[in-house]
């Protein structure tokens, strides 16, 4: 009936163009104003007449009927006048003839789209190229990326000078850290490694041999010899052992875990990502190495280091952290991920979204592990390590690095480690002798402001990092400095990630040489050329002080640390501060020495080595010692003087006995004339004191 339908002069038969020889089924609908007209070729873009076919495309079905190139453009992008062809890397297959005229950009032929293959890894001929299904994330052998050849051996990609300058900088680049005048003194730093069958330390990066492609990047980074922590950690990790490494700040801990992990990863190709099934399904990343850090700034810094040493390799480091746009991070993961650097919160979020699987993890690294395992992060760490598909500790290597490992954190960390080696590098207290430490007594904020202005106005060289306790104080102090025409900026947890990154960039480049920060910037940040650290507000824990001042005096460079000490607010760390200064051969002010003795007398100092009382301290020097050998506890013992300090606390046994209440050397305060002492039941407390069940 429809075929005979006639509405006025319009027939439905006229609305259908007959099917052509290359079409199937019903042909296209013809609007009324074009019915009965003769088909003509389309006009050119300038309206001057029929479009001409593009040279080189005459064999296509659409070229004769489509417009030519846009005025001013080359015939196609590969043959344009401003196009510079790139050479194909050795061993890479040639592209199809249509792509190999004057350029070799096409390293593999395009595939037909199949909705059911979305997200799957490509076949061998596509892997390592932009056509491969998501693993390598870049064109094969182009842009500073390597690839895996058909035999599964790693092939180094070509040089990319622009990327090289971005990653490694120039020889005199002020934004990059270079070794200082005291770097050679690192060889004299004492090292203690405990555990059975500890591998011998190395003296050069080539023994045991790191992968040659990693070594070339180490040379570009101008690293000549390994630091003490690297001399021990590289053979330990390459030997398959778990590690807890305690090393002074600025001693190369990041390289201590990155170098062996990347070297091992370059010897053996990791597993491919699981294929996503069905149209629109999202690909899941399967990293083989996971590095966790407590702050966004620290993981960003580790990621930058990983990018540097993955240059011209097929390894792809990625970073995920909160406060940044998630979409971009997900797109980066879709391009492939071998090494994942993350903060715990964002990682858990992405795991719950099904975008990251930890099933193939071979290496788990906790940087600044003492903070990662404290009460704030412990639930998230357990969710990641014990509540996911991550292999258990017997099927992976676990590495922990920090400047301090208090005894309670060491006990907790043993849940995640297997038969680990404890590495202690540096002096007791974990501060560097490269740092000159000064303590200034300031009771009020007005006194601190005056002293701060005197310091900043008299020393205008290098970068100055000022630590305060609260976010509000950070903003107020930076405004105060700006009012006095001093270029300052602030960084703290209430600032957006973009603002924090901007502040760090201004500080790193020296355009704003004074940075006021809360503890968010204290842990692990490696900012080159920081010459002065000022503790406007001292922290409550001596371990936090160690981490703060470690932002200067890095990689053998010298630095200055100034702390404003308030008797009313900082009295409880006086004893620990005195011991720390003495251990680092620093001058101890008279007022602080007197306060330290008072702290011993009343047992108010927060834990330490034998000579300190205190409540629930952290064992003093045992923060850098293996509790399996030295013992330790929450108090660390008492004063051992003429009056009892009643310090100490519940702790592990020391070397002197199996059940000591004091841990280390010292028990409940030392008592009268040396009594009530001893590290364990029945051990004498001193040369004249009798045995005591205390």
UniProtKB/Swiss-Prot annotation:
<dbReference type="Pfam" id="PF00270">
    <property type="entry name" value="DEAD"/>
</dbReference>
<dbReference type="InterPro" id="IPR044763">
    <property type="entry name" value="Ded1/Dbp1_DEADc"/>
</dbReference>
<feature type="compositionally biased region" description="Gly residues">
    <location>
        <begin position="630"/>
        <end position="640"/>
    </location>
</feature>
<comment type="function">
    <text>ATP-binding RNA helicase involved in translation initiation. Remodels RNA in response to ADP and ATP concentrations by facilitating disruption, but also formation of RNA duplexes.</text>
</comment>
<dbReference type="InterPro" id="IPR011545">
    <property type="entry name" value="DEAD/DEAH_box_helicase_dom"/>
</dbReference>
<keyword id="KW-0648">Protein biosynthesis</keyword>
<keyword id="KW-0347">Helicase</keyword>
<feature type="compositionally biased region" description="Gly residues">
    <location>
        <begin position="604"/>
        <end position="620"/>
    </location>
</feature>
<dbReference type="GO" id="GO:0003743">
    <property type="term" value="F:translation initiation factor activity"/>
</dbReference>
<keyword id="KW-0378">Hydrolase</keyword>
<dbReference type="InterPro" id="IPR014014">
    <property type="entry name" value="RNA_helicase_DEAD_Q_motif"/>
</dbReference>
<dbReference type="GO" id="GO:0005524">
    <property type="term" value="F:ATP binding"/>
</dbReference>
<dbReference type="InterPro" id="IPR014001">
    <property type="entry name" value="Helicase_ATP-bd"/>
</dbReference>
<keyword id="KW-0547">Nucleotide-binding</keyword>
<dbReference type="InterPro" id="IPR000629">
    <property type="entry name" value="RNA-helicase_DEAD-box_CS"/>
</dbReference>
<dbReference type="GO" id="GO:0003723">
    <property type="term" value="F:RNA binding"/>
</dbReference>
<feature type="region of interest" description="Disordered">
    <location>
        <begin position="1"/>
        <end position="158"/>
    </location>
</feature>
<feature type="region of interest" description="Disordered">
    <location>
        <begin position="602"/>
        <end position="640"/>
    </location>
</feature>
<dbReference type="InterPro" id="IPR001650">
    <property type="entry name" value="Helicase_C-like"/>
</dbReference>
<keyword id="KW-0694">RNA-binding</keyword>
<comment type="similarity">
    <text>Belongs to the DEAD box helicase family. DDX3/DED1 subfamily.</text>
</comment>
<dbReference type="GO" id="GO:0005737">
    <property type="term" value="C:cytoplasm"/>
</dbReference>
<keyword id="KW-0963">Cytoplasm</keyword>
<feature type="binding site">
    <location>
        <begin position="247"/>
        <end position="254"/>
    </location>
    <ligand>
        <name>ATP</name>
    </ligand>
</feature>
<feature type="short sequence motif" description="DEAD box">
    <location>
        <begin position="367"/>
        <end position="370"/>
    </location>
</feature>
<keyword id="KW-0067">ATP-binding</keyword>
<protein>
    <recommendedName>
        <fullName>ATP-dependent RNA helicase DED1</fullName>
        <ecNumber>3.6.4.13</ecNumber>
    </recommendedName>
</protein>
<dbReference type="GO" id="GO:0003724">
    <property type="term" value="F:RNA helicase activity"/>
</dbReference>
<feature type="short sequence motif" description="Q motif">
    <location>
        <begin position="203"/>
        <end position="231"/>
    </location>
</feature>
<dbReference type="InterPro" id="IPR027417">
    <property type="entry name" value="P-loop_NTPase"/>
</dbReference>
<dbReference type="Pfam" id="PF00271">
    <property type="entry name" value="Helicase_C"/>
</dbReference>
<feature type="compositionally biased region" description="Gly residues">
    <location>
        <begin position="130"/>
        <end position="146"/>
    </location>
</feature>
<dbReference type="GO" id="GO:0016887">
    <property type="term" value="F:ATP hydrolysis activity"/>
</dbReference>
<feature type="domain" description="Helicase C-terminal">
    <location>
        <begin position="434"/>
        <end position="596"/>
    </location>
</feature>
<keyword id="KW-0396">Initiation factor</keyword>
<feature type="domain" description="Helicase ATP-binding">
    <location>
        <begin position="234"/>
        <end position="423"/>
    </location>
</feature>
């Amino acid at each position: 009936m429809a075929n005979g339908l006639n509405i006025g002069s319009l027939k439905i038969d006229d609305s259908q163009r007959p099917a052509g020889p290359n079409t199937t089924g019903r042909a296209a609908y013809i609007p009324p104003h074009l019915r009965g007209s003769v088909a003509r070729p389309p006009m050119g873009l300038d309206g001057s007449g029929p479009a001409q076919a593009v040279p080189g495309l005459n064999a296509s079905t659409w070229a004769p009927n489509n417009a030519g190139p846009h005025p001013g453009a080359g015939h196609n992008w590969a043959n344009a006048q401003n196009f510079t062809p790139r050479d194909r890397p050795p061993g890479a297959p040639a592209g199809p003839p249509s792509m190999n005229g004057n350029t070799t950009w096409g390293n593999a032929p395009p595939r037909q789209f199949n909705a059911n293959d979305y997200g799957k890894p490509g076949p061998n001929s596509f892997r390592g190229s932009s056509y491969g299904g998501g693993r390598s994330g870049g064109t094969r052998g182009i842009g500073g990326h390597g690839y895996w050849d058909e035999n599964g051996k790693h092939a180094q990609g070509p040089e990319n000078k622009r990327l090289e300058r971005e990653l490694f900088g120039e020889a005199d680049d002020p934004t990059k850290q270079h070794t200082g005048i005291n770097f050679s003194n690192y060889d004299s730093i004492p090292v203690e490694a405990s555990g059975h069958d500890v591998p011998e330390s190395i003296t050069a990066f080539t023994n045991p041999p790191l992968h040659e492609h990693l070594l070339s990047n180490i040379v570009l980074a101008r690293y000549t010899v390994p630091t003490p922590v690297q001399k021990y950690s590289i053979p330990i990790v390459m030997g398959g052992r778990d590690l807890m490494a305690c090393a002074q700040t600025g001693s190369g801990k990041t390289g201590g875990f990155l170098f062996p992990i990347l070297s091992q990863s370059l010897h053996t190709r990791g597993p491919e990502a699981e294929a996503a099934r069905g149209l629109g399904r999202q690909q899941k990343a399967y990293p083989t190495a996971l590095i966790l850090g407590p702050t966004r700034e620290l993981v960003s810094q580790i990621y930058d280091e990983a990018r540097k040493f993955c240059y011209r390799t097929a390894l792809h480091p990625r970073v995920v952290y909160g406060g940044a746009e998630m979409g971009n991070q997900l797109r980066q993961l879709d391009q492939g991920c071998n090494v994942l650097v993350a903060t715990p919160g964002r990682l858990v979020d992405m795991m719950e979204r099904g975008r990251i699987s930890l099933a193939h993890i071979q290496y788990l690294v906790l940087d600044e592990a003492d903070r990662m395992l404290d009460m704030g992060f412990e639930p998230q760490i357990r969710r990641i390590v014990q509540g996911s598909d991550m292999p258990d500790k017997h099927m992976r290597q676990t590495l922990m690095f920090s400047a301090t490992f208090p005894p309670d954190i060491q006990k907790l960390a043993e849940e995640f480690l297997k038969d680990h080696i404890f590495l202690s590098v540096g002096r007791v207290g974990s501060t560097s002798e490269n740092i000159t430490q000064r303590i200034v007594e300031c009771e009020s904020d007005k006194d601190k402001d005056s002293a701060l202005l005197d310091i900043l106005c008299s020393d205008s060289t290098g970068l100055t990092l000022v630590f305060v306790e609260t976010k509000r104080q950070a903003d107020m102090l930076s405004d105060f400095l700006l009012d006095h025409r001093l270029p300052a900026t602030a960084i703290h947890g209430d600032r957006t990630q973009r603002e924090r990154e901007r502040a760090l960039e201004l500080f790193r480049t020296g355009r704003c040489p004074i940075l006021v920060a809360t503890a968010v910037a204290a842990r692990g940040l490696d900012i080159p050329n920081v010459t002065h650290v000022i503790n406007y507000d001292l922290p409550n824990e001596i371990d936090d002080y160690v981490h703060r001042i470690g932002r200067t005096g890095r990689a053998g460079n010298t630095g200055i640390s100034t702390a404003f000490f308030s008797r009313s607010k900082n009295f409880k760390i006086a004893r620990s501060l005195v011991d720390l200064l003495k251990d680092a051969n620093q001058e101890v002010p008279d007022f602080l020495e007197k306060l330290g003795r008072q702290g011993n007398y009343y047992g108010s100092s927060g834990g330490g080595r034998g000579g300190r009382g205190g409540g629930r301290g952290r064992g003093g020097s045992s923060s850098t010692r293996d509790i399996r050998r030295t013992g330790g506890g929450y108090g660390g013992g008492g004063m051992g003087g003429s009056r009892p300090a009643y310090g100490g606390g519940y702790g592990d046994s020391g070397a002197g006995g199996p059940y000591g209440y004091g841990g280390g050397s010292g028990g409940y305060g030392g008592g009268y004339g040396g009594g009530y002492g001893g590290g364990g039941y029945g051990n004498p407390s001193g040369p004249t004191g009798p045995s005591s069940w205390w």
